[in-house]
Structure formats: C-alpha cells, structure tokens
C-alpha cells in the first residue's frame, strides 16, 4: 500500500486536528452535569453512554493524519481504563490541554525533548503530592459516595458499597441483565463455577432440582472416567466413611456413570458427578485452584497418579456442595489457609503481568472465587438502550470504587489536581525549556475543573480563581453549584484514577511534541462505477 509522509508543523497539526475531534466529543460528558453521547451501531439499537473510553473506541476518522492523532489519544483513555477503570475523560481532557500548550511552545522555538523532560518531571511531582494527600477508605459510606459520583446514581452507589462490603476487595462484582425493572443484588457463597450435574439422577432435592452434599469428599481429576474400575476403587474407600463423594472430571461416561447413578438410586452410596470448568490450560489452573481450596490433589497421568491405586489422601473436603443443572458451589473448602493465601498471591502476580484484557478478567474471576466471593448486580430498565447505558455506568462505578479502596480518595471535581500542582511547584526547580515544560503541566491541570464548570453552565476561569483561594479539600460541587468541603460532601475521586489520568496524558503529550514526521497509509481511490450496458438498438 502506498504511503503519505508529512513533516514538522504539517504532521503535528494534522495529528492535533484528530486529537481535537476526539477530545471535543469526549469532554462533553465530564462532571455531574456532563451530557451523553449516542453511538450508532451497525446492528441493533444505538448505545447511549458517558464513558470516555467507549466513545473514543467508536471514533474512526477519514483523514490518515487525523486518525493517527485520534489513535494516540485513544491510547490515553484505554491505558487509564486498564489501570484504574475510570478517569478516561479526565485523561483525554488533560492530554488535549498538554498538547495544545506544548505545540504553541514548539512553534515558538522551544526544544521538544526538553519540554518533554519538563512535562514528565512536573507530572511526577504532582503525582507525589496526590499520593501524599490520599485519604484511606474507612467506611461503607465512602465507597457508596465515590461509586455514586461515577455512576451519577445514589441507588447504584449503595448497591456497589453493599456488594464490596460483602465480597471484599478481592471479590468480583459482575453486572448482568435483569428480566424485571430495577436493581437486584445477589451473592454467591463459596466457589461457584458454571458446570452442573452430568445427569439429573444425582438430584437430592426434587423441589429445586439440586444435589446437596453435606460434608463430602471431593475427587478432582483432569481425565475422563469411563470404565467401572475408574470409580469403584475410590467409591469403596469413601463408602466406608459414610460420607458422600463429589467427582469433578473432564467427563464421566461409559460404565462409570451408570455405576454411580445406580448406587445413588439404591441409596447404597451418595455421589454426584460434574464436568470440570474451562478448557485446556485454564481448566488445569481452575482444577488446581479447587485442589488448594479443598485440600485435594488433582489426579492426573502427568503426576503418575492412577484412579485404581490412589488412597484417601488425594481427596479434598468441604462443608457443603450444592449442584444444580447449570452450576456448582463449593462452600467452606477444607484446604489450608496458608496454601490459599499463597495461591491468591500467585494469581495477583499473574494479573499484574498480563497484557490481555481477557486473561486479566479470567484471572480476577479465579481470584474472587478463592479469596473473596462473587456479587451480581442485575440491571433492568424500560428499554434495551437504557439498560445498556445503565449497565455500562455501573461497571465503571464498580471499578472506580475498587480503585478507591486500593489507593485512597482525594477531593473530586478536578480540585485535587490544582491543589497538588500548587504544592508541587515549590519542589520542581528547572531551567530553560524544561521549566517551560513544567509550566505547561501546571496550566494543563486546570483543564478538568474548567470543563466540569463549563458543562455545568459556569465560567471555568471564575471557578478556577475561586478554588485557588480556598483551603485544601474545598472546591466546587458542580452538582449543586456550591463551594464546600468536597470530602465531607462525598465528592471524591480515587487517587489511582487521578494519578493514572495525569501520568498517561503526560506520556502521550510527550510523544506528540517530539513527533517530527508522520508516515500514513494513502487512502484508496474510490472504485470506478461499473460501465453502463451497451445500446442494443432499442
């Protein structure tokens, strides 16, 4: 494919135009009085959202230089979303302000490399002040307040606070569709996975069609159980104890399944067979999680273990197991707390090191099943479009609340950035173009509060001047247009969100300013129209 090349100011201005188109679309959503953006979909109903990264992902510009500029800012939003789960609009607004201020100075003759160093040093100094000003989350009300700000809905804030209070920081809060209007909250006790009994003959409770095993032994195997010999040996060992047996295997079929069912129906031996969840390496990892939780050992050919020769030491235990048609829940596994804690630490390390969103999500689910629990917020609304929009807001608010628990809270509404910058100025001693780069950051941090004020119908400059004269922690509550103590009023932002927004914006701004040439794909010429049919003489 042919390429287009632009240099110097032409390259930067083309990229800047793309940045502005994306940022101007995203920033209308900032603050409690921000507006929504409607996203057209090729199939199905349009999506209505105020989530910066969702809007950014949908923007695809025709001009190749503009497209590159927009893609760089998308990266700001995506990186902030990956790290903190929120703050994508703030990051976009900061990036736009930093790039505009920086390009003015590049055009005036400043050295882009020195500007970039100054921007990075000033951003680091402000982040240091933000972290120092953090207030730990100590109450359920504080979690509710920060989730309410993110979702713009007090009911959502309360539900999220209740969910996180129950499942803990390592727990998972998922958001699902509800077939009735409103919000419902469900909790899962113990480890639950999406596989049910292999045959309905294992059911012990006919009313709700579940198999309930009290104080069972648990056999975990990575292979299939097909022959009678695969189950008879272990069944005879467990039968002597008078306790039931849960079998979790790749599959149970052939002679093995009717052997278990027949003993179950006769009342000779109570058991239940379930397929192992997941596939491939993920299945192996989940079986190992269950082994650690229950104190079992996974029986597999790789370890040289055979079902016809193992003893009771490979079996795990649990207080109770509940198996339905579609899912299995293991309550109070008998594994060692130290082993569970070590496994949790290992999974946390894997989460920190993975670059895949899908892998991260699956690892977090495994972490929750081991260390916390699972809460499900079910969302119902009058229309599909409204339900999707509300669901999206709740997902953002959950991640916002988790970020607050992790690193603490700051005054919201863009105030923390201005007040941290005022303190950081004294620590940043630079000269020349590096000092100019730092000054760019100290001006750019005003952009979020200015945009919040303008979205609320106020003058941004007037609000900034007023906030500068107020004590630390006080600022504009844009929801009420009152100046007050923002932490006391529940107007807060997680430290993780605010610092990630600034760090990612500063990083992309530095790349923008130091760009001297852009190589882009040349647009394909439009296809020629098909030739008209020949005149047949009629």
UniProtKB/Swiss-Prot annotation:
PROSITE patterns: CHAPERONINS_CPN60
EC number: 5.6.1.7
Entry annotated with the keyword Glycoprotein: no
Keywords: ATP-binding, Chaperone, Cytoplasm, Isomerase, Nucleotide-binding
Pfam families: Cpn60_TCP1
InterPro entries: Chaperonin_Cpn60_CS, Cpn60/GroEL, Cpn60/GroEL/TCP-1, GroEL-like_apical_dom_sf, GROEL-like_equatorial_sf, TCP-1-like_intermed_sf
Catalysis: reaction(s): ATP + H2O + a folded polypeptide = ADP + phosphate + an unfolded polypeptide
Keyword Lyase tagged: no
An individual GO BP term: protein refolding
Gene Ontology cellular-component annotations: cytoplasm
CDD domains, per the entry: GroEL
Organism domain of life: Bacteria
Function as written in the Swiss-Prot or TrEMBL entry: Together with its co-chaperonin GroES, plays an essential role in assisting protein folding. The GroEL-GroES system forms a nano-cage that allows encapsulation of the non-native substrate proteins and provides a physical environment optimized to promote and accelerate protein folding.
Protein family (similarity comment): Belongs to the chaperonin (HSP60) family.
Protein name, as recorded: Chaperonin GroEL
Gene: groEL
